[in-house]
């Protein structure tokens, strides 16, 4: 009984520690993104106009109002920030509007916006194409030096462009401009959603807990031997 309690306590502590680290890292990445360049969102920016009714401004980010998810980014304005290369946009996949215009960006991968399923407006330097191509947006236009991509289309409805078809017992859902993902329906799981029945959560957690205890015991025993030898 005591051993079971100890194992459960160790597992709970490990989970809590991992969740704490994830929370701290998300705070750091949010701060890094919102302070990528000096100042704050310009008052003549489309992101500012959007944010004054939907949320509040912090640095170059717009956060959602009236929600327990106080760190939910719904707008991002990195225009005129002298950005030449964009690899990722950290925790801003919940953004509805993003402005990257007036930057010397020469190339922008579509994968930067993978997971941005809620994005409805994207402003880019005019020489860049909208992620996913014109077919992924309801409206694409160029105004002066800015390309505006509006109204992200649901990739699941564009069967001609889909390189893969979701397997049986799964559901297609949008996953950013030109992207989609397949999620297993209720009561199905595993490879290609071929397994039916509840996911064996208790069994998996038991295996993970046992593995953690074994590895920890081996490391502890090894360290003890080193201490005794010295």
UniProtKB/Swiss-Prot annotation:
Q: Name one GO cellular component term.
A: perinuclear region of cytoplasm
Q: Which residues lie on this side of the membrane: Cytoplasmic?
A: 222-230
Q: Where in the cell is it found?
A: Nucleus envelope; Cell membrane; Lysosome membrane
Q: Which residues form a coiled coil?
A: none
Identify the stretch annotated as signal peptide in this record.
Answer: 1-26
Main subcellular location of this protein, as a coarse class: nucleus
Question: Extracellular compartment: which residues?
Answer: 27-200
Disulphide connectivity of cysteines:
156-172, 166-182, 184-193
SUPFAM superfamilies in the cross-refs: L domain-like
Superkingdom to which the source organism belongs: Eukaryota
Give the membrane topology: Single-pass membrane protein; Multi-pass membrane protein
Which GO biological process categories is it annotated with? Answer: cell differentiation; negative regulation of osteoblast proliferation; negative regulation of protein catabolic process; positive regulation of bone mineralization; positive regulation of osteoblast differentiation; regulation of gene expression
EGF-like domain mapped to chain residues: 152-194
Q: What does this protein do?
A: Involved in osteoblast cell differentiation. May play a role in inducing the cell cycle arrest.
Question: Per its record, how is this protein called by name?
Answer: All-trans retinoic acid-induced differentiation factor
Source organism of the structure:
Danio rerio
